Every structure is written in structure tokens, then in C-alpha cells.
Curated annotation (Swiss-Prot):
PANTHER family noted in UniProt: ANTITERMINATION NUSB DOMAIN-CONTAINING PROTEIN (PTHR11078:SF3), N UTILIZATION SUBSTANCE PROTEIN B-RELATED (PTHR11078)
Keyword Transcription regulation on entry: yes
Taxonomic lineage of the native organism: Bacteria, Pseudomonadati, Pseudomonadota, Gammaproteobacteria, Pseudomonadales
Segments of skewed composition (Basic and acidic residues): 1-18
Function: Involved in transcription antitermination. Required for transcription of ribosomal RNA (rRNA) genes. Binds specifically to the boxA antiterminator sequence of the ribosomal RNA (rrn) operons.
Keyword set includes RNA-binding: yes
Protein name: Transcription antitermination protein NusB
Gene3D superfamilies, alphabetized: NusB-like
Gene: nusB
Gene Ontology BP annotations: DNA-templated transcription termination; transcription antitermination
Gene Ontology cellular component terms for the protein in this record: cytosol
UniProt keywords, alphabetically: RNA-binding, Transcription, Transcription antitermination, Transcription regulation
Disordered: region residues: 1-28
Stated family: Belongs to the NusB family.
Amino acid sequence: MISDESDRFNPRDPKPADAGKPSKSAKRREARKLATQALYQWHMAQHSLNEIEAQFRVDNDFTDVDGAYFREILHGVPAIKGEIDKALVPCMTIALEELDPVELAVLRLSTWELIKRVDVPYRVVINEGVELAKVFGATDGHKFVNGVLDKLAPALREAEVKANKR
């Protein structure tokens, strides 16, 4: 059998075995997107979290999704909703009840990450929240989300924010 040159390993052009597969951050981004939709549904329809999770797993392809992270967000946000909302209120110019439900879902998800997932840098949390608001929110919703999260991050991650401003 004659070997094809293209099959040989070329150290100048290394191709990892997982080339073409989504990265961990890409899988988490997809988990956040689905979790935002699921949290919106939970807020609007008041279905049980287990029902919503089961529906999302049937209706969506989880191949490129961090399923464990999706589940952690979906069950984690409602578990500390009171703490999340209490943290959000001082950073907002309008009442929670008046907020667009999509933006509320994004802000709750992002606040949960700031509180519970200190392994995720605050700048990543803010960026992901803004991107979610661009995808799902109203025309300028991302600007509102950015403003709220910019105020919230120093309150919840004071040391990390100060260290990054040096």
C-alpha cells in the first residue's frame, strides 16, 4: 500500500485529534443559550424544572452542549433566585417586575455565575451575558444587561475586579 503524503504527521501543521470538535467554552456558550431559554420558560409557564429539562433534552441536540452545565444553571438559578434578585435590585434603574423576561433570564443566569462559578472570570460572565442579550433580547437589551452586570460584578467579585483594574 502506498502511503499518501497528506497522512503523515507534519510538526509544522499539527492537527489535534479533536480538530473540528467544539471547545469547552463553545459547549458552555451553547449550554447558556439553552439555559436562558429554559429559564425564560420556567419564569413564564411555571413548569417544573425537571419537566423543562426533559423537554429541552428531547427537543434539542445536545451534541455540542455542555449538558452538565446546562443542568447546573437550570437548577441552580431557581435555587437561589431570592439571593440573585436581591443582588440585582441595587444595580437596576427599573423594578424586576417591569423588566423584559428575556433580559431577566439573562441577568439571573449571569448573576448566578458571578455568585456560584468563581472559576468563570467575571469578564467572561459579563461578555456571555451581553452576547445572550444580543441573541435573545430586545434591540438595545444588551446595553442594559451590560450596564447592570458592570455594576454587579464589583459587588460580587470585588477582589477579582480590583485585581484586574491594576
